[in-house]
Each structure stands twice: as C-alpha cells, then as structure tokens.
Design a protein with these regions (language model features):
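Structural motif corresponding to the C-terminal cap of alpha-helices
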Residues: 336-348, 426, 599
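Amphipathic, well-packed alpha-helical segments that form the structural scaffold of globular domains
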Residues: 286, 290-293, 303-304, 334-342, ...
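Transmembrane helix-loop junctions in multipass membrane proteins, especially transporters and channels
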Residues: 38-42, 381, 678, 682
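Membrane-proximal periplasmic segments of bacterial cell-envelope enzymes
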Residues: 1-314, 350-359, 714, 718, ...
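Solvent-exposed, polar/charged alpha-helical surfaces in well-ordered, non-transmembrane soluble domains
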Residues: 90-101, 209, 213, 238-242, ...
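Beta-lactam-recognizing serine transpeptidase/beta-lactamase-like catalytic domain environment
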Residues: 72-73, 78, 299-316, 325, ...
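Conserved SxxK-family serine transpeptidase/carboxypeptidase catalytic domain
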Residues: 194-215, 224-235, 239, 243, ...
Length: 744
C-alpha cells in the first residue's frame, strides 16, 4: 500500500469512528431522556400496577378493675369478608348463594338488617320492625330513604325496588328476599374495591374450616381475624361499662337543621363498618380505648394479578382503662343488695307489693372514687345481644341504671343538709331548741305531724337528727326558706351532677320557681319531700361531703389510663374539689353527733350493735301509690359514712317499696364487712368473705316482723297519726300527680 492509499484509509477510518461516536452520543442522549425525564411514566406503563389499601383494625383496649383484673377485653374472632378486588368477574349472586348455604349448614347467620320478613304463602312481605321500638322505626324510615321510596311505601314496595335494582327477578321469592337483604347491607357498608363487606361475624372455627375448604370456588371470600368485645366479669358494673356496637347510619352521616351534611366520624379516621363505644365508659373513653388501625397494601398488575401484599402500617392496640372499683367488692355489694331486698320481702313485705328493685353506691371519702355502684335487678353483658327482648320487656327494668339515673324523694335523709344550712348560716346553734308535741301548728288549716318516737318537748339539733324530729325541721326549714337550705344541699352534692364520666340524672330541689309552689312546700321540702328528687349516687356523694366536713370531691369511676403493652401509667385521675362549705364553728361536728346516734334507734338490725361507729340517716318517703285509703307505699332510703370519727367510705341506698329506711341497716353492715375484708385481704373473688357466716349474722327464713317500730325517727305518717291532726297528708294536697308523696 502506497502512501496515498494509506492516507485515504486513515481518513475513512476517522469518518467511521466519528460517525460511530455521533451515533453513540445520540443513543446516549435518548437513553438519558427515557430514563431521567420520562422514567416514571415508562416504568408505570411497563408494570401498570395499582395499590389498594385496606384497614387492619387495632385491638380495643381493656377495662380493668383497681387491681388490674380484666372486666372487659378483646378476644380474637373470625369474620367472613368479601373482597371485591379479589372477586374478579365472578357471578356475585351465585357466589352469595354458595356462601349462604355454607353458613346455614353450619348454623350461622349473616348480616341482614332489612326489616322485612320472608314471603308468605302468596308471596307478600311484611315489615318486622316493632311498633314500640324507636330504634326499629328509625331504621325503617332510613331504609325507605336510602332506597328512594316514600315513607308510606309497603314491604312489597321495598322488595320490588330491591329486585329491580339488583336484577333478582329470575330467583325464587325466598332467594329474592335473602339476596335483596344482603345487597342492601352491601349498600349500607359501601361495598367497593376499597371497602370490604363483612358478611358474617364471629363465626365458629368449623365455619372457618368450611369456608377455607371451598376457597377455590369462592374467590374474594376471606376469613379475617378480628377483635370482639368480651366481658370476662359480665355481671360486674354492666350499666356503667356500657356497650360497643357498629356505627349507625345516623352517626355516620349527620345532617344539620340547615341541610348541611357532614361525616364527623370519618373525619376522625373511622370506617363505616367500625365498632365504636355507644354508651357508658365504652363511649366516654372511646378515644383512649380505640387503638390506631394498621394498613395492609395489596398491589395488582394490569392483568388483575396480585403481585404483592404487605402490612405497611402495624396496628397499635388501644389503652387500658383502669377503674376505681375492685370487682370483688362490687360483687359483694351486688350480693348484699339482693339479699337485703329478699330479706325485706320475706320478713316485712308479705302483701301484694314487693320490694323488687334498688341501688347502692359506695364512695371513697378521701377522693370521690366510686368503690361500688350496684343495681338490682341487673343483667349479664355477654347475654345482652341475645336476651335484649327479654331484658327490655321485664317490668322490673333490669337495664335501667337506678344508681345513676333513678330519681327518688330523699325523705328524712335530707335533714342533715337542712341542719348544716341552719347552723352555718347562724339561724341556730347547738343550744337552740324547737318544741315538739307531735303537730306543727304554724299554718292555719295545715298541721303536718311528727311521730314523736323517742322524743318530745324542747328538741335541739343533735336530738332532732337522732330521732328525725319532723317538727324541728318544719320550723327550721320555714325560717330558713328553701332558697337557703337548697343552696347548701346543692353544695353538698344534691340536685346536681356529681361529675361521673357517664350519663347521670340531675335531679331537682324544691324551689319557689316550681309551678305548684306554696309556702307550705318549704316545710315539706325541709324533711326531704315536696318536689325534691335525687339519685343514689348523689346520696353517696352527699354523705361523703358530710364526712369531709363540707368538702365535695368530683365523683369518678376511672383511676388511670395505662399503656396496654407495658402497663405504664399514662395519666391518673387526681382528686378534684368541686365545692367547699367552710363550716362555721362546730357545724359538721354537731351533724356528725346526731348521725352517729341514729344506729342506736334502729331496732332489730345489726347496725345498732356494730362495733365500728357508723354515722347514718334513714329516710322513709311515701310513694304516690296507696295500698289502702290514706296509706301509701314507702321507699327505704339510707345515707351513711364510716368509721364515724375517721371516715373512709360513704354509702347511698334506695330500695323501691322497701318500707322504712331502717330496713337497710343490715345492708350498711354487710357493705362495711365487705369493705374491711377487702382491706385485710379476706374478701374472696366471688365477693364472699373468707370466714364462714355465723347464724347470728343472718336472718332466719321464718323470722316475722317485730312488733316495735323499726325506727320511730323515720316512721311514716300513717303509723303515727294524731287524731287531732286529721288524716290528710300534706303531700296529698301539694304533690304533683304521679310523683312520690311526702313522709312525715
């Protein structure tokens, strides 16, 4: 190769190299463009996947007693859940039929709240909503609204709409009703690719196995573990613990008076199918008990294939709520209340009207903690769902929270409040007296009476409390007026909320603003009658305030909030002073002296000889019902605190149709015995005390009512009628119809 040819070859090589470099540069620039500029778009086009996020429900926190013993807890259950994302193009109604048949074969039910019966022999449907059930009637109205029907629509109209909407005409009538109900439930639960449908809840392990065996023919049908509320001590404090339940349509979608619709629970992070506290402490402490839900992410590609499943957020359980109540003591008070009512019926109430209901509340005097809140009759939390109809139909009202919401005339238990008002205001002192001859004659034509049991003549305040002298309190009450003694009673805890965390009745103190007010009401209200009504928990709070010399604490059920994993205290309830009566001089000491002498006046009761001093006051208010002309049925009321000189607990008791308040004396002793047994470690888990009960501690079954007056201090007017005073009760003149009448 000559020199010229060599140069030509080199030039050609350089051109080829340059061309190759330019080509490589162009490819490089294109690659950069594809990867850096549009990389995400092309990656998405290449993979074409979609993420679906599903909620993993967190376990609800426990409710435990003061020792940490579980009362309410969460246990693992199993739900049958439909996942639309995984169902693909499967025939939905055909699949629903398969699931229903499997559930039926295992004795299971499924979610169906459609208030319509199965068709009768001629193919007609009827509504199953109970006429007297507000809940059912609201659900029925909501169902018609949801389906776009008028409120006058019949059950047949509703089924016709469901059959049309969900193309069910080809199915037999019974299947139309079954499938229509499930479709309606799906509508309520907003079933979609991102909202699973809970078809059946808390199914058995046998059902779980059956569903899994048929999994290949049931795509999208899953068994999902869930937390179910269970009450390990299901008869302990059921009225206060409250219940949990599904979020109702009314709570999920709220429309105000202006037609503005909001979803407050959704804004707080709830899903429509979530379980929420709906009453009692379960509701009051919802934010603490509710855990933080987790998130499961399912990734599906463009062909519909699941390519990844991951728990992207781990659920966190709710906090533990610890109560002030020791479940052993609560059981002991429950038992004592039931036995006291039984004793009253065996020994005293042998007529047609039996003592059938009552309540007892026990507080820690030092800080207002509730130690027991008993209702009789009561119910079992774990049976509530299955026996609701029986419970709600029971005339003795076992579902009614008498301890917190029952309103009762306090009778003579109100007298210490009047004594505090009179002493503290300076109207009287320890030497002041009122003459009692059994009749109060200040008013012309109206002469209310006193039993004069154990006393007569000039009576001072201590004696008046001991023997419950009506005339003393008539006169003092008239001179004070209800304006003054009501103000003191209010500060002592009567006629107002106690501060507990759950719903409670307010009550009422007789006032000049009452529609039936007349001057004589001031003397009636001074002995705890007139229009005055209070709750048992107010009576206990009142007794605790007397024991604390006028300092009233907020009454409360919750001791602390605990971390459910470590048990560490997150927050603790501190004693909170709600009101103080400073108390001039020896005001509260004089009232204490009178109250600690009351047990000695109660004959035929363990309270009269109890070795620890008890300060108490009984009440025997008349009810409006009569068992004979002029003879009214009576309630039994008691307030007490003990030990009298160094108070630890305060008690409030009411027993409907219990007769004299003195009949609750044994109940006070039984509560005291259980309390001290709890303190010294001899109180058993079932509420019984370690040592065997002796014969002296119980009332023989064949015992008859004593001939003597049980407590003259409290005897009703019909047992001490003075012929000179006439036979007309003041209560019959002034008490509104249907309200408890007076006891004199």
């Amino acid at each position: 190769m000559n020199q010229e040819e060599r140069k030509t070859a080199i030039r050609r090589m350089r051109v080829l190299v340059a061309a190759a470099c330019i080509l490589m540069l162009l490819y490089g620039l294109r690659l950069i463009f594809l990867q850096l500029v549009n990389g995400d778009d092309f990656k998405s086009q290449a993979t074409n996947t979609t993420d679906y996020k599903f909620t993993v429900t967190a376990a609800r926190g426990d409710i435990v007693d003061s020792r940490g013993e579980r009362i309410a807890t969460s246990v693992t259950g199993y739900n049958v859940v439909l996942n639309k994302l995984l169902m693909g193009d499967e025939d939905l109604d055909g699949m629903l039929q398969k699931i229903v048949e499997l559930l039926r074969a295992n004795g299971e039910s499924w979610n169906d709240t459609l208030l319509i019966s199965q068709p009768d022999a001629v193919g007609n449907y009827t509504f199953t909503a109970e006429e007297g059930s507000t809940r059912d009637q609201k659900a029925l109205a909501a169902m018609k609204d949801n389906l776009g029907l008028q409120q006058y629509a019949t059950a047949n109209d509703v089924m016709e709409k469901l059959v049309e909407d969900y193309d069910l005409a080809s199915y037999p009538l019974s299947w139309q009703r079954t499938l229509g109900g499930i479709h309606y439930e799906m509508q309520l639960q907003a079933f979609s690719n991102v909202n699973n449908f809970i078809m059946a809840e808390n199914v058995s392990e046998a059902t779980v196995a059956t569903i899994k065996e048929h999994s290949l023919s049931l795509p999208g049908v899953e068994i999902v573990e869930t937390s179910t509320r269970s009450y390990e001590q299901s008869t302990v404090l059921p009225h206060v613990l409250g219940r949990v339940g599904k979020i109702t349509a009314e709570k999920w979608k709220v429309t105000d008076e202006n037609g503005q619709t909001t979803y407050p629970l959704r804004e707080k992070g709830y899903n429509m199918n979530d379980i929420i506290g709906i009453s009692g402490l379960e509701s009051a402490y919802e934010d603490e008990l509710r855990g933080k839900d987790g998130v499961e992410t399912i990734t599906r590609n463009s062909d519909g294939v699941i390519v990844d499943t991951a728990l992207t957020t781990v659920p966190e359980p709710g906090h533990t709520v610890q109560l002030t109540i020791d479940s052993r003591f609560q059981k002991a008070v429950d038992k004592a209340l039931a036995e006291n009512i039984d004793m009253i019926n065996r020994v005293y109430n042998t007529g047609s009207m039996k003592a059938a209901a009552g309540a007892a509340v026990v507080l820690d005097v030092k800080d207002g903690s509730v130690l027991a809140a008993s209702n009789y009759p009561s119910f079992d939390q774990n049976l509530y769902a299955t026996q609701y109809s029986e419970y709600s139909a029971d005339e003795s009202l076992p579902l009614f929270n008498r301890a917190l919401q029952g309103l009762y005339t306090p009778g003579s238990t109100f007298k210490p409040a009047v004594a505090v008002a009179a002493l503290d205001s300076g109207l009287i002192n320890q030497y002041s007296t009122v003459f009692c001859n059994g009749v109060y004659t200040f008013y012309k034509g109206y002469s209310p009476r006193c039993t004069r049991h154990g006393h007569s003549g000039n009576i001072d305040v201590v004696t008046a409390i001991k023997w419950s002298c009506n005339v003393f309190f008539y006169d003092v009450g008239r001179r004070l007026t209800s304006d003054v003694y009501d103000a003191y009673a209010y500060k002592l805890g009567l006629g107002q909320r106690t501060g507990v965390e759950v719903s409670e009745a307010v009550g009422h103190l007789t006032s000049k603003n009452d529609s039936n007010y007349m001057e004589s009401l001031d003397v009636q209200a001074a002995i705890g009658q007139g229009n005055t009504v209070v709750t048992p928990i107010q009576l206990a709070t009142y007794a605790a305030t007397l024991a604390n010399n006028g300092t009233r604490y907020r009454t409360h059920f919750v001791k602390a909030i605990l971390d459910s994993n470590t048990g560490e205290v997150i927050s603790e309830t501190q004693p909170e002073v709600m009101d103080i009566i400073e108390g001039t001089g020896n005001t509260f000491e004089l009232v204490r002296q009178g109250m600690r002498q009351v047990p000695s006046t109660i004959t035929n009761s363990k309270i009269s000889s109890y070795p620890i001093a008890i300060a108490c006051k009984t009440g025997t208010p008349q009810r409006s019902e009569t068992y004979a002309p002029g003879k009214h049925y009576l309630n039994a009321i008691m307030v007490a605190y003990l030990p009298a000189d160094d108070p630890q607990i305060a008690i409030g008791i009411t027993i409907e149709y219990g007769g004299y308040g003195a009949r609750t004396g044994d109940l006070v002793v039984d509560i005291a015995n259980a309390y001290f047994a709890m303190q010294d470690g001899t109180l058993n888990e079932d509420g019984t005390i370690g040592k065997q009960e002796t014969a002296a501690d119980s009332t023989p079954a064949d015992q008859t009512a004593p001939a003597q007056t049980e407590n003259g201090a409290d005897a009703a007017a019909d047992t001490a009628t003075d012929p000179a005073a006439g036979t007309t009760d003041a209560a019959q003149e002034t008490a509104p119809a249907g309200q408890d009448a007076l006891d004199n």
